[in-house]
């Protein structure tokens, strides 16, 4: 069985590292303690895990991300709900403005001077602007509240996931990575 060049390079580097460690320790240049040994073992584990289990982690994470995205799609989109509400409010305001304009036009001119007509129009415009500002604030408030609710539920889910001691360390690391990906999407506005 022929080894690939990257495998051969990795083996050569490992062999060279072992030889240099042995040479340095025999000359008493490098002194080992428990922390150094643990750190070297950890680095070796990370390199081994990345090479041998990299695709397994990727497939598992992709599956979890897909499942989370499917669950998130079941929630109603707050932007659509607020947009429908704002369209309805605008339609009602237009109708009210038309009715008020008709009422003002139907008043006899003797009782309603041109100044009064301008005052009514100014009042209606001001009311319309206040409603529009309120609606804009409601949209942004609802969006922020939705994101905060989602983040809170995520933290709760993460806490419940770690509450059970039967979960392995690898599963915990995998779950943390998934959670971070989704939280970045939420905080960055990656989905609407």
Curated annotation (Swiss-Prot):
- Biological processes annotated in GO: proton motive force-driven ATP synthesis
One GO MF term, please?
proton transmembrane transporter activity
Note the superkingdom of the native organism. Eukaryota
Q: Which terms in the GO cellular component ontology are assigned? A: mitochondrial membrane; proton-transporting ATP synthase complex
- Which compartments is it annotated to reside in? Mitochondrion membrane
Q: Which InterPro entries match?
A: ATP_synth_Bsub_B/MI25, MI25_plants
Q: What does the UniProt function comment say about this protein?
A: This is one of the chains of the nonenzymatic component (CF(0) subunit) of the mitochondrial ATPase complex.
**What is the official name of this protein in its record?**
ATP synthase protein MI25
Q: Where does this protein come from, organism-wise?
A: Arabidopsis thaliana
């Amino acid at each position: 069985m022929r080894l690939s060049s990257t495998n051969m390079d990795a083996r050569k580097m490992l062999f060279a590292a072992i030889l240099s460690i042995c040479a340095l320790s025999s000359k008493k240049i490098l002194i080992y303690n428990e922390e150094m040994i643990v750190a070297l073992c950890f680095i070796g584990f990370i390199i081994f895990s990345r090479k041998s289990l990299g695709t397994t982690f990727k497939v598992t994470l992709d599956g979890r991300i897909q499942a989370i995205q499917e669950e998130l799609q079941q929630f109603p989109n707050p932007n659509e709900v607020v947009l429908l509400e704002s369209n309805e409010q605008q339609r009602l305001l237009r109708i009210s403005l038309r009715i008020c304009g008709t009422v003002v036009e139907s008043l006899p001119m003797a009782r309603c001077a041109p100044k009064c007509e301008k005052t009514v129009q100014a009042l209606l415009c001001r009311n319309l602007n206040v409603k529009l500002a309120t609606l804009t604030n409601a949209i942004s408030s609802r969006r922020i509240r939705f994101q905060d609710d989602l983040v809170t539920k995520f933290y709760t889910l993460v806490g419940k996931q770690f509450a059970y001691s039967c979960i392995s360390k690898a599963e915990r690391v995998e779950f943390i990575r998934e959670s971070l990906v989704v939280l970045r999407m939420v905080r960055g506005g990656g989905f609407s």
